Amino acid sequence: MPAISKKKRSKIAEQILSYLYEISPEASFTVKIADEIVRDEEFTKSILEELEKSKLVVKVNKGPEGQDYTKWSRWRMSNAAFEAYKKLH
């Protein structure tokens, strides 16, 4: 499988951020985000982890009732990224 260029990875990251902005302040599971941007779940997770390192998204480790997630990951846009996106839109 050919490597994806940095430019294309950047465009996919923009799609993810756009989706998270639309549903903000809600968090979404990795599988739902992958479905929305029509990408593989593992690939989407790798992009989300890059965005987390850049402090653009935040990983949610607990469910609404306080239970810890062991297998799943939910993601939401960070507050700083949300404010920056809000100024653009």
What are these regions (language model features)?
Residues M1-L17:
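Short alpha-helical segments that sit at the start of domains
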Residues N61-S73:
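Short, Lys/Arg-rich nucleic-acid/phosphate-binding segment
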Residues S18-P25:
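Short, locally clustered residues in the helix-turn-helix/winged-helix DNA-binding domain
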Residues E52-P64:
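A short, conserved structural fragment
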